[in-house]
């Protein structure tokens, strides 16, 4: 137990992020009456977009993905939108009393117009894909929620707090760990105060991937009230193809390969050449006096015999444990630090009076520690 906790406090476990090939990012932004959803679809194949007109028992919609048998993302004519991210696989338990549709996501997009209705379908029906995927749903009113599955809880529904919601490839309720792409998206949104296509693409550009191990195949921005889709291919944000959903549905069912929409644009050879882009600069500078206030000794609440010492080291913090290698923490916000290079995050608990009371290590789970001494 003691050694395990020391290793946890040093962030010595393996990375929690998904592989580059499946590391996607979704976010919704609600500001000044605008409701937008952005997505980077990171994979190793070119994308397609297809339109499905309405019928007496089905809402019309636009789908994006790689195979018409499975939509990775979608928006229907009511302004309900979803996209998905891959997750580390966990045991999923079905409910024998619940029906299991062939494809619950299709059923929701065919029949629902709001996030509340979508969430109710997840409560009503079984959804086996939740074992290794999660879904962000958003609607034209601005509501959004992330639906996932936790082995110790079951269905996890996290609604938007504040003016945006972000999800990458970790379960939000499993721990407070957020990957560098998540942190970078937060930083870009904090620096820009509007909800515009330009702001959405600024986020997407900051967190896109490229390289032989996986790349951003396509990116989408959905304007839910306007029922419009802005499509970008292979992380080339200088070229956009805009779709009006109502107009496209009026053309009947049709499918488009994304590459054909961007003649002369980026190619697969362009985005797979060179080194893999998998790191995102999230480090910020903090004044020395802010860093100094976190120095001291901390003891994990579940094992108070373990002592972790933290001291300022230039523009970072250094973590010391007897008999273990030192670890470096670099700041991403005034109270949140990443264990370099990305072995977890640490958030410091600061009282309203500015007193540092403890910290929380965020990894596969959250480990709380109390500050017991100052320098």
Regions found by a protein language model. Give the residues of each.
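A broad structural signal for short, well-ordered beta-strand segments within beta-sheet-rich domains
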Residues: 24, 71, 355-359
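Peripheral terminal and inter-domain segments
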Residues: 270-375
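C-terminal, well-structured catalytic/ligand-binding subdomain of enzymes
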Residues: 25-110, 133, 138-282, 290
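Bacterial N-terminal signal peptides that target proteins for export
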Residues: 1-9
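Sec/Tat-exported extracytoplasmic proteins
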Residues: 112-113, 125-129, 211, 298, ...
């Amino acid at each position: 137990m003691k050694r395990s906790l020391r290793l946890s406090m040093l962030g010595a476990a393996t990375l929690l992020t998904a592989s580059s090939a499946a590391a996607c990012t979704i976010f919704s932004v609600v500001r000044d009456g605008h409701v937008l959803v952005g997505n980077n679809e990171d994979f190793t194949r070119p994308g397609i977009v297809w339109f499905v007109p309405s019928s007496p028992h089905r809402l019309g919609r636009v789908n994006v993905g790689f195979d018409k048998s499975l939509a990775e993302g979608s928006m229907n004519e009511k302004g309900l939108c979803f996209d998905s991210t891959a997750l580390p696989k966990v045991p999923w338990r079905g409910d024998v009393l619940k029906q299991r549709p062939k494809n619950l996501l299709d059923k929701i997009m065919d029949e629902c117009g709001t996030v509340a209705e979508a969430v109710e379908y997840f409560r009503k029906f079984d959804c086996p894909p939740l074992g290794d995927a999660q879904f962000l749903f958003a609607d034209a009113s601005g509501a959004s929620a992330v639906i996932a599955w936790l082995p110790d809880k079951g269905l996890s529904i996290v609604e938007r707090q504040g003016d945006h919601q972000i999800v990458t490839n970790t379960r939000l309720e499993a721990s407070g760990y957020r990957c560098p792409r998540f942190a970078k998206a937060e930083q870009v949104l904090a620096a820009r105060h509007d909800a515009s296509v330009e702001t959405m693409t600024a986020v997407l550009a900051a967190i896109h991937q490229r390289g032989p191990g996986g790349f951003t195949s396509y990116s989408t921005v959905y304007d839910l009230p306007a029922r419009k889709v802005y499509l970008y291919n292979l992380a080339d944000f200088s070229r956009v193809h805009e779709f009006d959903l109502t107009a496209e549905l009026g053309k009947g069912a049709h499918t488009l390969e994304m590459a054909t929409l961007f003649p002369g644009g980026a190619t697969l050879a362009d985005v797979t050449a060179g080194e893999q882009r998998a790191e995102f600069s999230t480090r910020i500078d903090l004044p020395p006096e802010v860093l100094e206030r976190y120095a001291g000794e901390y003891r994990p609440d579940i094992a108070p015999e373990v002592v972790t010492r933290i001291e300022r080291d230039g523009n970072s913090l250094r973590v010391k444990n007897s008999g273990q290698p030192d670890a470096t923490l670099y700041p991403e916000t005034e109270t949140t630090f990443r264990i370099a290079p990305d072995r977890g995050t640490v958030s410091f608990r600061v009282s309203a009076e500015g007193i540092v009371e403890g910290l929380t290590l965020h990894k596969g789970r959250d480990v709380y520690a109390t500050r017991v001494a100052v320098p």
